[in-house]
Swiss-Prot record:
Main location: cytoplasm
Protein name: Lysine--tRNA ligase
Reactions the enzyme catalyzes: tRNA(Lys) + L-lysine + ATP = L-lysyl-tRNA(Lys) + AMP + diphosphate
Lineage of the species this protein comes from: Bacteria, Bacillati, Bacillota, Clostridia, Thermoanaerobacterales
Protein localization: Cytoplasm
GO biological process, any: lysyl-tRNA aminoacylation
Annotated Gene3D superfamilies: Bira Bifunctional Protein, Domain 2, Nucleic acid-binding proteins
Cofactor entry: Mg(2+)
Binding site for Mg(2+) 2: 415
Known partners and oligomeric status: Homodimer.
Keyword Cytoplasm tagged: yes
Superkingdom of the organism of origin: Bacteria
First-level EC class: ligase
Similarity section: Belongs to the class-II aminoacyl-tRNA synthetase family.
Amino acid sequence: MSNSNDNIWNNTEELNELLRIRREKLNILRSMGIEPYGIDRFERTNVSSDIKNDYENFEGKVVTLAGRIMSKRAHGKASFADIQDRDGRIQIYVKYDTVGEKNYEIFKILDIGDIIGVTGEVFKSKTGEITIRVTDFKLLSKSLQILPEKWHGLKDPDLRYRQRYTDLIINPEVKEVFLKRTKIIKAIREFLDNRGFLEVETPILHTIAGGAAARPFITHHNALDIDMYLRIALELHLKRLIVGGLEKVYEMGRVFRNEGMDIRHNPEFTLLELYEAYTDYYGMMELTEQLFAYVAQKVNGTTKIVYQGTEIDLTPPWKRITMVDAIKEYVGVDFNEVKADAEAVEIAKRLNLETKEGMKKGEVIALVFDELVEQHLIQPTFVMDYPVEISPLAKRKHDNPAFTSRFEAFIYGREVANAFSELNDPIDQKERFLEQLKQREAGDEEAHMMDEDFINALEVGMPPTGGLGIGVDRLVMFMTDAYSIRDVILFPTMKPKND
């Protein structure tokens, strides 16, 4: 394609003139008795893919389609155009002798971007392209904006995200990502439903922000005159349902964290959390690797994917390693030999890591892992047994209470899942909440709040339970080879353009 249309975007005066001409055409059409937005309903017999995938059966038949004009080529008293619908593009052929003088004049006035409905006979052009020989057409909607021919001709790199509607029109590969996202979410539900899980809905507005170490968004409930929080996790309400006897529950929904934004983080994102009574984190490992493999097979037809040029094999079983052993393998430090907090802090300093005053050994272990190990975990890996200091909702390991029965799954150096053997001891849970409160009072806005009702639920009695959280957007990123989380969220959070 020519760059001529792209150059328009660099010339404000020329762009404004073209926009003015489009509005002028609107008035011309109305003067001809055509109301550009007057049709409420248009009945189609087919979409483009029906015809293109089964030409032999459609050849010579009359069909009715609708779509957006994406290109237009006039040749005297005959014109070709491509219209685009949900499934793709198809060529149409409009001839003066067939549609009549007035209709042909109307067609000549139409612009790229206009939406039309056409009726005509299916045939192949001289070049062999499947085409509709139009006998009648109707203008369904007049476009008053100019469609860019290709996005790399635009100066504003964020425009694709700000105007996703245009992005979807111009770039079919973008639409494919979001169609695949829908299939991924459907496959997740299929997998869990087939395992007997019950999908539930829990509140989005919370009086206590809990279930994750994150800074919440705060809002105000006028009728109750109280501040409330947009949920940062689904965990604590779902565990209440386990206490209530539902045994196997999951929820997939939006959560909100008032934190930084980068290629892996959007303040509003989709989270899957599930809880299963009478199992532990080993059961969650098996479920996680089976879920990823099921989704990949269902959506991509294989358990091997290529992400940013690297082949990733999702076939179970995945590698399993403790956090301490992973540090030993990749950093050469054995924290099993480290007894005191001060000694751990000194090791971190020797590794040129930034430490905070009063750090405990477990926090140092997590710091070393995050900074020096994560990036090495390319193939699917379960990193197990996290320090208790960073796992306030996970059960302690019976043979080593300084660590918890928790894992995170990593792919391509990124965390994709987080799971525990859930803490069901109400006394231990309250003590950990109190420790988190001390951290909040010391200025840690991400530390957990005290949730007395959740403690009460645990006192009623929660069975041994395994819990799992998966960031759905990151899963979609891997399945679609998307570089940024913004590429898999239809309308990512953006700073207003006028700021």
